[in-house]
Swiss-Prot record:
Name the record gives this protein: Fructose-bisphosphate aldolase A
UniProt key word Secreted: no
Keyword Acyltransferase among record annotations: no
Oligomer status and interactors: Tetramer.
Other comments on record: In vertebrates, three forms of this ubiquitous glycolytic enzyme are found, aldolase A in muscle, aldolase B in liver and aldolase C in brain.
Keywords: Allergen, Glycolysis, Lyase
Length: 15
């Protein structure tokens, strides 16, 4: 699971 589920898919892509 992602640590930032509240972020948009684009934001998670930067992570």
């Amino acid at each position: 699971p992602h640590a930032y589920p509240f972020l948009s898919p684009e934001q998670k892509k930067e992570l």
